[in-house]
């Protein structure tokens, strides 16, 4: 069993949180990294914390192939749908949060079957 198969077995789903207003764009062109969204001028609504985004814009991470890249060149997903980002969203937006946001469930197995390069 290779590393990708082990990952899929341990983590069958990833979760992506965003304002529901982003869904048409996601359905049309997919989930993009923060830098791709900014380059294409697609950010119509932003609930993120500016201080956190500033920090992330300067932060790099090592990929599974050994390369290092800025995390804003990657898509931020979560292993658990109940996480700090969603908690903060609920806190900042208030009761209307449920009707304004969406958590997308991403099947990891389908991702790797359709594009094995995603691990890199």
PLM region descriptions:
Residues 1-76, 83-120:
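Active-site-proximal loop/hinge segments that shape catalytic or ion-binding/gating pockets
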């Amino acid at each position: 069993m290779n590393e990708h198969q082990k990952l899929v077995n341990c983590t069958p789903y990833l979760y992506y949180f965003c304002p529901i207003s982003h869904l048409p764009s996601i359905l049309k062109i997919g989930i993009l990294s923060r830098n791709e969204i900014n380059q294409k001028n697609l950010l119509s609504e932003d609930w993120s914390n500016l201080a956190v985004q500033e920090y992330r814009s300067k932060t790099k991470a090592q990929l599974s192939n050994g390369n290092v890249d800025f995390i804003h060149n990657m898509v931020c997903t979560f292993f658990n749908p109940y996480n700090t980002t969603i908690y903060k969203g609920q806190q900042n937006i208030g009761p209307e949060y449920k009707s304004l946001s969406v958590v997308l469930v991403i099947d990891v197995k389908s991702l790797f079957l359709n594009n094995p390069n995603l691990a890199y």
